[in-house]
Amino acid sequence: MAEMVARLASERAVVVFTKSGCCMCTAVTTLLGELAVSAAVHELDRDPLGKEMEKELARRLYGSSGRGGPAVPAVFIGGSLVGGTSKVMAMHLKGELVPLLKSAGALWL
């Protein structure tokens, strides 16, 4: 499953793993859309392997136990895991998100 998540996370400059109906997922994808980022979005609750991918994302976010909070949204930029809602929003407020998106080729401005 780790290889599958890594492959999916590298398919575009920005990849977001979400669940439909998750308001924090919507907040992150809306922010990226407003920044004109064309992210690949994978809704885990609509994927037959979604539960296994969610466990892998939790492990990546919170360590080997996979415990510590929600696994979605999980945002990858340039193939690297950035984090969830709080990390992405904090980066945006500090002015760090746009430069990272530019360096990954997700923004051209």
Curated annotation (Swiss-Prot):
Domain Glutaredoxin as annotated: residue spans: 2-108
Cysteine-cysteine disulfides: 22-25
Cytoplasm recorded as keyword: yes
PROSITE patterns assigned to the protein according to its UniProt record, in alphabetical order: GLUTAREDOXIN_2
Gene3D superfamilies reported in the protein's UniProt record: Glutaredoxin (3.40.30.10)
Residue ranges of the motif Responsive for interaction with TGA factors: 106-109
Assigned keywords, A-Z: Cytoplasm, Disulfide bond, Electron transport, Nucleus, Redox-active center, Transport
Record localization: Cytoplasm; Nucleus
GO cellular-component term (any): cytoplasm
Chief localisation class: cytoplasm
Entry function: Has a glutathione-disulfide oxidoreductase activity in the presence of NADPH and glutathione reductase. Reduces low molecular weight disulfides and proteins.
Annotated PANTHER family: GLUTAREDOXIN (PTHR10168)
Family to which the UniProt record says this protein belongs: Belongs to the glutaredoxin family. CC-type subfamily.
Name recorded for this polypeptide: Putative glutaredoxin-C11
